From Swiss-Prot:
Protein name: Adenylyl-sulfate kinase
Enzyme class: transferase
Family statement: Belongs to the APS kinase family.
Organism: Penicillium chrysogenum
Keywords annotated in UniProt: Amino-acid biosynthesis, ATP-binding, Cysteine biosynthesis, Kinase, Methionine biosynthesis, Nucleotide-binding, Phosphoprotein, Transferase
C-alpha cells in the first residue's frame, strides 16, 4: 500500500445518499466457467433493473474490461488475481455511489472472490456498515460449456493453443455458499434473471416495482 496518503471522507453519508437516490448500492458478482452464460445473464439483468425497476445499474464485463483498464494483464494466476482485485475495487466504487455493479468474470479462485467480498463488507472510514455483496454462481457442467464454446476457446485449450484455461488446464473453484445458485443449463435466461431479482427483492435491496 502507498504511504503518506490520507482517506478523505465524503460530506454525505451512505444513508443520506440512499435516501436522496431511493436506491441502495451493491455489487452482484457473477462467477462461473467460460461459456456458462455469465455475460448473457448480466446483459439481461442490467436491462431489467434499469428498464423495469428504474435503478442505476452498470455491467463490468470480463472481456470488455480487458480492452481498457486491464489490457496489460494476461491469464497467469498472478494476472488473474490482479484482474479480480482491480474489478473488485471498481465495483466497490460503483456500489459506494449507490449504483448496482454487475460483474461477470470467471473469477476462478475462491480466495479472490472472498477478498472481493471482504472489500465490500468491511466499512470504510466514516461509515458504520459495509456494502452488500451478492455472489451468483452461474453453474454449468464443463461438458455443457464445452459444447456451447461460442468463442472456440475450449477447442483451442484442448489443442494446447491456450494454456492455463479454466476448467481444462487450470482449476475453477466453485462457490461453497453463494447467495444465488443459478443452474444455467436448466433455466431459460428470463427465469435465471428472475431468480436473481427475486433474491434482491427478498433482501430489500431494490425499491418497490413501479406499476
Amino acid at each position: 500500500m502507498s504511504t503518506n496518503i490520507t482517506f478523505h471522507a465524503s460530506a454525505l453519508t451512505r444513508s443520506e445518499r440512499t435516501e436522496l437516490r431511493n436506491q441502495r448500492g451493491l455489487t452482484i458478482w457473477l462467477t462461473g466457467l467460460s461459456a456458462s452464460g455469465k455475460s448473457t445473464l448480466a446483459v439481461e439483468l442490467e436491462h431489467q433493473l434499469v428498464r423495469d425497476r428504474r435503478v442505476h445499474a452498470y455491467r463490468l464485463d470480463g472481456d470488455n474490461i480487458r480492452f481498457g483498464l486491464n489490457k496489460d494483464l494476461g491469464f497467469s494466476e498472478a494476472d488473474r488475481n490482479e484482474n479480480i482485485r482491480r474489478i473488485a475495487e471498481v465495483a466497490k466504487l460503483f456500489a459506494d455511489s449507490n449504483s448496482i455493479a454487475i460483474t461477470s468474470f470467471i473469477s476462478p479462485y475462491r480466495k479472490d472472490r472472498d477478498t472481493a467480498r471482504q472489500l465490500h463488507e468491511v466499512a470504510t472510514p466514516g461509515e458504520e456498515t459495509g456494502l452488500p455483496f451478492v455472489e451468483v454462481y452461474v453453474d454449468v457442467p464443463v461438458e455443457v460449456a464445452e459444447q456451447r464454446d461460442p468463442k472456440g476457446l475450449y477447442k483451442k485449450a484442448r489443442e494446447g493453443v491456450i494454456k492455463e484455461f479454466t476448467g481444462i488446464s487450470a482449476p475453477y473453484e466453485a462457490p461453497a455458499n453463494p447467495e444465488v445458485h443459478v443452474k444455467n443449463y436448466e433455466l431459460p435466461v428470463q427465469d435465471a434473471v428472475k431468480q436473481i431479482i427475486d433474491y434482491l427483492d427478498t433482501k430489500g435491496y431494490l425499491p418497490a416495482k413501479k406499476e
